[in-house]
Regions:
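Gly/Ala-rich phosphate-binding loop of Rossmann-like dinucleotide-binding domains
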Residues: 31, 35-36, 132
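Beta-strand-loop-alpha "switch" segments that mediate conformational coupling across diverse proteins
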Residues: 180-229
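Conserved C-terminal guanine-recognition region of P-loop GTPase G domains, centered on the G4
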Residues: 152-168
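Inter-lobe coupling/hinge region of RecA-like P-loop helicase motors
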Residues: 215-249
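Inter-motif core of Ras-like GTPase G domains
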Residues: 126-146
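Hydrophobic positions on the alpha1 helix immediately C-terminal to the Walker A/P-loop
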Residues: 25-26, 30
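Pre-Walker A adenine-sensing motif
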Residues: 1-5
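P-loop/Walker-type NTP enzyme "switch/lid" segment
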Residues: 7, 15-21, 35-115
């Protein structure tokens, strides 16, 4: 989109124009892998006032920990070895998100290098468009549904055009991400819209995320040794096989210049 010097921390937004495309699940998985495995100091801002998926995930996990001595003991051992607390998650309104983040950054002693924003399910309002332009990067998951793809591409083009035309806009790039792909289904829609994205100069991740019931496995279902979606643990490595998650995380780090050193 455009090349500007990225300031620290990097602001990374997750936005979609349709509910149920896996936006929050992907944000949760990315945050936990980057923080717990790759050592990236980060914080999460849940702006999705209607769902609050990220914030409510943490709340559910706290309840499970309170109710299960075994899980509590295993997590205690994990964090004792990890040497740090869980990353911060706070909820706020979209129009207050940036102010809240700045307050957090001035109050914390941790050198936060990445802030992940989970946007509401419909990112088309004025407040959300303004917030979009204040991100460094946006990840927008899409599914092979022509009706929802129209609005997703319209949002991507709006952010791109405003990001280029407004000199003070922070946004550097928005990337679409094919998500929940059925391996046995036809790729006609995916191929068509991938070509369309190229023709419109809209960036797509090379990696694709494949449909899997494993994304729904929280602490309550899988326990510490079988969890996929958690704010306290990264997805169990063996469960990621075939999902595209590992490849996607590596591409995120490369494209957004998130150093793991």
């Amino acid at each position: 989109m455009k090349s500007v010097q990225t300031v620290s921390p990097i602001y990374l937004g997750f936005a979609s124009q349709k509910g149920g495309v896996g936006k929050s699940s992907l944000a949760e998985v990315l945050a936990s892998i980057l923080y717990y495995e790759k050592g990236i100091p980060l914080a999460v801002v849940d702006c999705d006032g209607t769902q609050e998926s990220f914030y409510k995930l943490r709340e559910r996990e706290r309840n499970i920990i309170d109710e299960s001595p075994d899980i509590a003991e295993q997590l205690k051992a994990f964090f004792s070895k990890f040497g740090k607390r869980a990353y911060t998650i706070f909820r706020t309104k979209p129009e207050e998100a940036l102010i809240q983040v700045k307050q957090l950054l001035t109050q914390t002693e941790e050198d936060i290098r990445l802030v992940i924003f989970d946007f509401p399910g419909h990112a088309g309002t004025t407040e959300l468009l303004n917030l979009s332009l204040e991100m460094d990067y946006i990840i927008s998951p899409i599914e092979a549904d022509p009706q929802s793809l129209v609005s997703s591409f319209a949002y991507a083009k709006t952010v791109r055009d405003l990001g280029i035309s407004l000199e003070d806009a922070r946004i550097q790039d928005l990337l679409l991400l094919w998500n929940k792909i059925n391996r046995s289904a036809s790729t006609v829609v995916i191929d068509h819209y991938s070509d369309y994205a190229k023709s419109e100069d809209i960036n797509l991740f090379d990696t694709r995320i494949y449909h899997s019931v494993k994304f729904a496995r929280e602490l309550a279902q899988g326990g510490v040794k079988g969890v996929f979606r958690s704010s306290y643990l990264p997805p169990v490595a063996s469960l990621r096989t075939g999902t595209g998650v590992n490849e996607w995380v590596e591409e995120v780090c490369r494209r957004f210049k998130i150093s793991t050193e």
